[in-house]
Amino acid sequence: MENQVKTADSSAMEDRSLSQTELRMDALSRGGKLFIWSLRYWLVAVRLKQPPASSLRDAYVAAGCAEGEILIDEVMSLIGVASKRPVEIRCCCEMCLSEDETLLLSCLRLLQAGEVDKAATELDALMVPALSRSVCRIADQYRGLLINAGLSLTSPRQFTVVT
């Protein structure tokens, strides 16, 4: 599974210049930040041979959505075994999301909008289509936990004061 879900290597991170199209962590809602942080921290826990759900538990209890860590573990485990190619999950300290992290966040946002078929179709590009719906079911449960805790996946627009 670790071969399919990977971090960006440090040389690639050094060579990469900030793209206008990359989504930044500071532009995400609290729910979006928690989701991306969880993907990244899940991978760190797997690499350290620690149980990922246990490693994430305190953050989810503090966020008011206990059991979110279990759903993240299920989603990431399924993606790890069913992905068609290596999935890029970036280092916890990275400010910009990878294309794969952006795709996963987009799928959650589609689920929040009730667009289950569209979310599954987007996931088909990343993983074996037969399991896309399973990931969507689990991700939708996760989305529900976030919403019940007051953590939306869509961020408010960036506002500036105009005088």
Task: Please state what every model-predicted region is.
Residues M1-T163:
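Polar/charged low-complexity regulatory segments
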